[in-house]
């Protein structure tokens, strides 16, 4: 096993089979650095040598292609500067920022990024559980002690804390909470309070799934407001029943591509460095598969190995 760069604890598995084949399961992989992890561009030859992996009869790579159809469009430093500018302008206008995130990986990464950029942060939802694991308990304790980070507390005043944070009663503190889809989690409670306020901003930092409330927000936010220009959010009541809330969207919205998955060029670098005899591609759309397949064929030409899309329940002959 070796680290994959995707998130704390993610790993690439190398398996030597009795028939002499060597299997490499990349899992989710990231070739670029994040706030809490260092990217992994290639597998080191010294690591492969430890298990005599180059001596395998064949090397079979099973990898992902979440971003197989696209390369990085905006550098991280430029993106960070744009994020800081958006937040500073929001504070100047008297608004607040809501950043719905995936609780694992993205949440701790975004909290760490906001702190590095000089902001105090309010954290809610499942991110409270993953933050200490991914940034470290010692650092989190420091942030809590000096007031850099506030965690929402369970209790009778839970809903009041949501309203206070949403309306700036704790000062300007961007709110980081799950879930990134806006279909569930504490993010829905904050969105109900914040989306109707023109001075606020909703910030997306990850993939926007088709059919999700987050995707719908970015499809309507620039349209004239009026009847029908709302999104319906599903909020859990005290009895854990889903209740629909129609929310009129008046705040602005911005997307930042802080993906934790390798881009196309990074996937090509990983594959070509390994020099596999067979490649299977999973965890992707058809566009993602075709994008990576085309890039590998362009890079390797006649030396390109067979490449197959590893769709669910499809059989392949090795």
Give the positions of each predicted feature.
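Short acidic, glycine/proline-enriched helix-loop-strand junctions
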Residues: 279, 288-316
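Proline-aspartate-enriched helix->loop->beta-strand connector
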Residues: 271, 275-281
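Active-site neighborhood of phospho(di)ester-bond hydrolases with catalytic His/Asp-centered motifs
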Residues: 3-4, 24-29, 62-66, 98-102, ...
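Redox- and metal-dependent alpha/beta enzyme cores, enriched for Fe-S-associated oxidoreductases
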Residues: 195-251
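Short, well-ordered alpha-helical microsegments
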Residues: 10, 33, 107-110, 183-185, ...
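A short, acidic, amphipathic alpha-helical segment used as a generic capping/interface helix at domain edges
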Residues: 185-194, 259-273
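His/Asp/Glu-rich metal-coordinating catalytic cores
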Residues: 1-116, 120-124, 138, 143-146
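Hard-cation-handling environments
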Residues: 81-213, 221, 282
């Amino acid at each position: 096993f070796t680290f994959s760069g995707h998130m704390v604890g993610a790993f690439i598995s190398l398996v030597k089979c009795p028939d002499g084949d060597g299997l490499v399961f990349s899992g989710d992989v990231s070739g670029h650095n994040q706030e809490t992890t260092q990217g992994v561009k290639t597998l080191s030859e010294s690591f492969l040598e430890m298990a005599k992996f180059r001596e395998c009869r064949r090397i079979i790579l099973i990898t992902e292609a979440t971003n197989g159809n696209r390369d990085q469009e905006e550098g991280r430093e430029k993106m960070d500067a744009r994020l800081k500018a958006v937040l500073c302008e929001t504070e100047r206008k008297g608004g607040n920022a809501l950043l719905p995130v995936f609780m694992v990986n993205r949440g701790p990464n975004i909290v760490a990024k906001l702190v590095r950029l000089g902001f105090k942060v309010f954290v809610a939802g499942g991110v409270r559980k993953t933050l200490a694991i991914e940034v470290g308990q010692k650092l989190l304790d420091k942030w809590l002690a000096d007031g850099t980070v506030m965690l929402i507390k369970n209790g009778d005043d839970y809903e009041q804390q949501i309203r206070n944070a949403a309306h700036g009663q704790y000062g300007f503190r961007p709110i980081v909470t799950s879930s990134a889809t806006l279909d569930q989690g504490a993010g829905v409670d904050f969105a109900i309070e914040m989306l109707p306020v023109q001075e606020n901003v909703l910030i997306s930092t990850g993939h926007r799934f088709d059919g999700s409330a987050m995707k719908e927000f970015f499809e309507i936010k620039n349209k004239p407001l009026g009847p029908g220009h709302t999104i319906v959010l599903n909020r859990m009541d005290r009895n854990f029943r889903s209740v629909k809330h129609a929310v009129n969207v008046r705040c602005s919205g911005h997307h930042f591509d802080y993906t934790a998955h390798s881009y196309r060029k990074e996937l090509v670098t990983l594959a070509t460095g390994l020099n596999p005899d067979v490649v299977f591609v999973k965890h992707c759309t058809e566009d993602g598969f075709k994008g990576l397949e085309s890039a590998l064929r362009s890079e390797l030409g006649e030396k390109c190995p067979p490449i197959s899309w590893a769709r669910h329940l499809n059989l392949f002959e090795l």
